[in-house]
Amino acid sequence: DSIYAEYYVVPTFDSSLLPDGFVVENYNFNGNEVQSAYLAAGDIRLLFSESAEGTNAGLRIYYEDDNDMMDFVPFLGYSGYVFPVRYQAQIPVPTNYTGSYMPFDKKVVACYIYTELTNNPLSVQAGMENKDTLQPGESTADADPVSVDSLDEMPEFYLFYGMNNNGEENFYLYDWKEGTYQRYVERDTSYDLD
């Protein structure tokens, strides 16, 4: 079950909460007409929901294919913004990263942390796993998330799969200390420089 199973979609919301690029439109959610926000560039729909107690209200990304939601957490940058989206396995999780959650403003942000911080063996590079025990598209990064509260030191960097305001998806590295992000580029440093 989703952690949002006991959340309720609110029929209207304040459109000033939306970043540039999203447009407000009516949407039929489970037979009810509600306001939604839609980013055509990325085919992303936001709904405003809250808990049964009327708390923890906010915009959430709605995935119609499995009737699930995830917190909408935009990270603002110099020329736009990025926000975490559901990980699609077309792009392998970078080597040496382990699944976790970023504690961000009472929101749930699925992310990855550098495996060395977890005191666990290094994860296998995506695509090099034992094919007999893993399902197609599955990697060691798909294991149960590591709680950052259980670590000896809090991570300073979190890797997340996200989308920018132009609808482009990629991995992004969030610097917890500086409050900044950048597109993640994995570099091959295994060769010697002469």
Which residues fall in each region the model found?
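Soluble mature domains adjacent to a membrane tether on cell-surface and organelle-surface proteins
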Residues: 1-193
